[in-house]
Amino acid sequence: FGLLVGPKALDGIDLATTDSVVRTLAEATLALVLFSDASRVDLGHLRRAVGVPLRLLAVGLPLTILLGAAAAAVLFGQLTAAEALILGIVLAPTDAALGQAVVTEPRVPQRIRQGLNVESGLNDGICVPLLFAAVALADLESDISGGRGAVRLLVEEIGYGVAGGVIAGIAIAVIIRAAGGRGLIASRWYPVIPAAGAGLAYGMASALGGSGFIAAFVAGVVFRLALGRDPEQLNRLIDEVGDVLNGVTFIIFGAVLLGPTLTVLSWQLILYAVLSLTLVRMIPVAIAMWGTHAGRPTLGFLGWFGPRGLASIVFAVIVVEESRLPHEHLIVLAVYLTVGLSVLAHGLTAGPLAARYATWYESHPHDRRPAMESAATEMTRPRGHATDAVPPAARGEPV
């Protein structure tokens, strides 16, 4: 929609101001999403269940980054090794929101939906420090003295980000526990606390010189651990606001960022975008699932549904703001084109392919269904799908 209305919507608008609005909106949205996603995942269960999510994160994600960097180095010969690595990292995180029908289709095996959902919830947070490290490496490559400053900045970004996240996560968990035990907060105000906590983590880390994104992600993890349960009801406001901001971000992305990108296309950019959404994702997924006896339809399903979205857009903004890369414009063009193609391709195929995959799975008799896909697992709630609107404290239950 943003792409269609872009030329008319931008008529007479200061693009410099618009770019600033896009950056602010996208960064705020990602901070909320990082907090919400991190707080939804039970890390203890993830450690115990050495299954699809752990394989996709521990094996698939690093291989996706490396293969994406290799493809960038081959197609864009002007990029340095560090710049190619940056492009690989920026396009590694997946965005399950772009294929919502996949993780919410009840006929798709729960273990497969869980794998894609958890992968999407954690890989953007994992990639944030990797991106800062790659940017520091690029600066070190081009200027030794400046690179040393970049390394110091990297340590500060991660260190202060973690510190801000830990403090904010513990603080909001303590507030909810204390207030819940004494009935100090009306039930309708509970969802405000995590939203404020995400903002507190981001603001505290940024003020100290750290990464607000790392802080938001860490705050979500710590909040979940300190609270001792899935804060699904408490995150209702974050989920709803995040969904709205996410939609607005993509509309503006199409109007402001994607449109100009389409005017400077090259065959290398198009080929890289196609490879990024196919082989660069599918080969690592197939390797990660080696030995699980997953069926070919399952490997294809997991490999295809790795949409690129919000995190990649914000990471591209970080590259522009935090680095002095000689070819940052090329990196940004590749990212924007890949995300735009992903929005179109995954949006159109999510429903039909989820139904087709479910039909394949259900075509097997109950006693002969594929073992890997049929294994029972605890399902993590997809973003924005709370099951209970009232916090336990408001019902008189312990928090």
Where do the PLM segments sit?
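Transmembrane helical cores of multi-pass secondary ion antiporters/exchangers
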Residues: F1-P398
